[in-house]
Amino acid sequence: MKHLYEKLIPEKRYEGTYADFPSELIDGVLITEALLKIRLPLQLLPRQMVVGYLPSGPISSVGFTHGVPGSSSLAGVTFLSDRRVRRALLQKHGMKVPEGATFSYESKLEVVKYIRRIGYPVVIKEAMAQELGERGVVVNNAQEFDAVIKRLRVVDERMFSPQADYKNSAYAITGLLPTVTTEDGIELKNEKHRFLVEQHVPGNKVRLIVVHGSVVCALSKPENTGYDGYNLLKMPHRYQRVAEKVMDALPGVRTLCIDIVVDNTAGDVSEQQCCIVEVSERLHLHNVLFPSARLAKKIASSIVENEVSYVKFAAQKNMAFFNRSVTTPCKAKGLVDCDKFKEEVDKFYSTKNSGLVLEWQASDAIKGQMDFILKGGTSEVSSFLNSLSCGHGVSVRPMSIDVF
């Protein structure tokens, strides 16, 4: 039987507050919204880190980075960033992964021999994940391969822009090889920098969203349809065995986004009936948000629920999917120019038509602090706060934002 909220709120494709938000920020914005709904005092920091402070209980705070809970270990997410380590761990636990090997940019002959052996198409990825959740490029012939490798080796200056703060991996620096500069002034990655070549695996692509060991969502990605999104699959528990095996192989990570390839999506799937093509600690909830905003928010609430040992949340969790209104006093800290910050925020606020109310309070130019109040739905407040903290639409960013 459907829950009452499912009957009252018909399912539709998402066209709400986050429709034009960068996909890299969606996980963190949904987590912030879930925290706002239970009225925890918050602190928003650079790299989309949000800390919720608990008034009582065995722990005093909970933290999330890009939506990844603090209960995930640094070692666990670093293993995921190093695709060689991740592949080895999965294979050690009996999981199928695409045939593949890593090469440096100076190993041109070895790469040609290897691809000649496994055949096209192949998938090219960084050996160390540079951006959150990047999935690689499929190439079908030698000409495409040369073009992709040439493009991949160029150091992308956007990696060092303010906007890259919410795209780049924020957990650990996994490679510090010096770059080289061509006669034309183009900066290239070191010739010893490594990339991964994997055999492309045909079949039905399925994405599993796993929270604390349970598959909470399964999505399929149609191929050759012109549609770039995902479709929800019924009965995600069919993939539970696969998720459990991957979690066993990659300890220390509480949330996982697992991409697999299967022959069909109709029946139960075991670890021997699929190929693991990608794993990320990021859930990529933007892929869930557009087919089902309700489910995406439910998943974010379940992540918070698993992190927070707090009786107040237990009393409210059944209502966590409704768009509730909040009034939140806020304090922006670490501002170099308070007047410029206010000007930028007012300009950004004027472009919003979401019913959000912004009220400026006291400011302290000496301390670099400004107080303001936000009134509106939790999704609108979360969107606005994350925009200010991450520099999305606002060029002047505070060092932190306290939410009371």
Residues of each region from the PLM?
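Conserved N-proximal alpha/beta basic substrate-recognition cap immediately N-terminal to
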Residues: 3-119, 129-132, 376-404
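Short, surface-exposed charged micro-motifs
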Residues: 41, 205-207, 259
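Domain-scale recognition of functional cores that engage charged ligands
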Residues: 132-134, 202
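ATP-dependent carboxylate activation and anion-phosphoryl transfer catalytic cores
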Residues: 11, 224-404
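Phosphate-binding site of ATP-dependent enzymes
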Residues: 150-229, 234-238, 246
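Short, flexible loop/turn elements at secondary-structure junctions
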Residues: 104, 128, 199-201, 262-264, ...
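Protein kinase-like catalytic core scaffold
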Residues: 122, 216-217, 275-278
